[in-house]
Amino acid sequence: MSFSPPPTEVFDVIVVGGGHAGCEAAITAARLGLSTALFTLNLDRIAWQPCNPAVGGPAKSQLVHEVDALGGVIGRLADATAIQKRVLNASRGPAVWALRAQTDKRHYSREMLQLLHHTPNLALREAMVTGLEVDGDPEPAGQARITGVRTYFGSVYGAQAVVLTAGTFLGGRIWVGHQSMSAGRAGEQAAEGLTDALKQLGFQTDRLKTGTPARVDRRSIALDQLEAQPSDAADRFFSFDPTAWASGEQMSCHITRTTAATHQLIKDNLHLTAIYGGIIDSKGPRYCPSIEDKIVRFADKDSHQIFLEPEGRDTPEIYVQGFSTGLPETIQLELLRTLPGLEQCVMLRPAYSVDYDYLPATQLKPSLETKRVRGLFSAGQLNGTTGYEEAAAQGLVAGLNAARLIGGQEPVHFPRENSYIGTMIDDLVSQDLREPYRVLTSRSEYRLVLRGDNADRRLTPLGRELGLIDDRRWQLFNDKLQAMEEEKQRLETVRLKVSDPVASTVEKESGAPIRGSITLADLLRRSGVHSSDLVRHRLADAELPLAVREGAEIDIKYSGYLQRQQQQIDQVKRQSLRKLPADLDYASIGTLSREAREKLTAIQPTTLGQATHIPGVSQADLTALLLWLELQKRRSQKSESLASSTNSR
């Protein structure tokens, strides 16, 4: 190893990168009593939201609830800075309910910076980390140990553990059309040297791509001609801590759509993008495609929905969600003006793509420590994920396990059956993912169990055991548990009699008669009856917290689900050797996710067991495939039986 100068400073933990993963990692390690330093290229862009200024959404909100249940901060800050909140998938079952908050991005960043400044044991440093200090030979893997980092200007900082959370900054290059420049994101330099340092230690790196749409001036949009989308969930929050709740002035988003002119302009100029022009071939996020990808992949669609989302209360900037593009700047304004309501719009910032180096996460342990270098951890977009929520969850896990490594404690592994955090990490470290990973409810075979509302019941006891939950939060949690148990007991014992004044109204609304009497629990088990209906009919206490009422309702409605789900999982395990027909048309199986249909069609596994190892094919997909095979088997047996009966006549 090369000789290094004496360290300028020494810390227990160094976190490299000040995004959502880095902030959670640094705060977690510091709260566990470790002297921690967060290194970032720009202290004025802490926890910045360079793409969509929003937190939550399907599966992502569950992650945010889980991080909060473990003492993390993303949920608290989203609650404090929300300017619009909505519940997605509200008409479906609780497994896929999702809270989504439009946040004030500048306010969010300021709040995070203040939180970092006031966290004991945590120091902030603005510097570019370009190298890793290591003791021992990296070959064979696992023999080397991290001892610190080296910065661009030659300073060395010592540490027993280092967490890399560099986001899109490693070798980052932004593209607008065929023109490009070195940058981690618009206006900020890329990180130099760290990719080479990782390669010298024997790590494999690859390239991924993402992008962000243009920002337009709100004052130049005819919002009065567009459909408004106001907040509908001002009373719902990510955090389980009421002291974090805030209900400031809400702002509406607006909806427009692409037109035939939009599609034609894109088709005519596809060759001018870096991807379709063949200049770069990095994989972009499957579930957040550019508008060019939408037009190409969904050629049969005449129009695509576009959301106009405010970036904050004190800025006129509007984020054009669903309209990221790699087209040249000279075409982007013309393209924007094909959208209804934007005919006279002013473009404040052009859209761009960014491709960057990442560290395939199969090189990590489930603790997010690297397999090659002891004490070196990696989290966030560097691991190939996409999204602030995925990054925050990984940051918490990496910071936690870095602290435990230094303390001589066993790492914490999150099982996939107990959290979306565990599902995500299991997918990352066990599958050879070659495109940006986004958490989805369909990736979890346990999704009704892994709801947002019960994240505290699943994880807060663990957080308390690990030292991440203080006495006040622990008391809040236990008070909620007690209130829920009391409410469930009340619902199971209190009966509504047919002679009660509200009985006839309840019968009419539920569509079923009350024979003599019925417990409130059995009433809740009826389709379409909810705890809010009990409150409306004065059969439940309106002062009872919403989380308590809804939690009790869900527990009662879905009490038998766990057993049925476990039976399905066990059946999948037993069926791992089951042969798959060579001519199986996966594209025709509608219950499979789109990704699973594509991957299964391409690979054509011969057994169900082989299908379990295909990246992008989740346990939920395997269950759906197994059920489909069983259905086909029964249909075949029935046809054979009918044919046999006919022939015997």
UniProtKB/Swiss-Prot annotation:
Family from the record: Belongs to the MnmG family.
Binding site for NAD(+): 284-298
Binding site for FAD: 17-22
Main location: cytoplasm
GO biological process: tRNA methylation; tRNA wobble uridine modification
Cofactor dependency: FAD
Taxonomy, superkingdom: Bacteria
GO molecular function: flavin adenine dinucleotide binding
Entries under NCBIfam families matching the protein: mnmG_gidA (TIGR00136)
Subunit text: Homodimer. Heterotetramer of two MnmE and two MnmG subunits.
Subcellular location: Cytoplasm
InterPro entries: FAD/NAD-bd_sf, GIDA_C_N, MnmG, MnmG-rel, MnmG-rel_CS, MnmG_C, MnmG_C_subdom, MnmG_C_subdom_sf
The protein's role, per its UniProt record: NAD-binding protein involved in the addition of a carboxymethylaminomethyl (cmnm) group at the wobble position (U34) of certain tRNAs, forming tRNA-cmnm(5)s(2)U34.
Full protein name: tRNA uridine 5-carboxymethylaminomethyl modification enzyme MnmG
UniProt keyword Plastid, yes or no: no
A Pfam family assignment: SAM_GIDA_C
HAMAP family in alphabetical order: MnmG_GidA (MF_00129)
Cellular component aspect of the GO annotation: cytoplasm
Matches recorded under SUPFAM superfamilies: FAD/NAD(P)-binding domain (SSF51905)
Keywords, comma-separated and alphabetical: Cytoplasm, FAD, Flavoprotein, NAD, tRNA processing
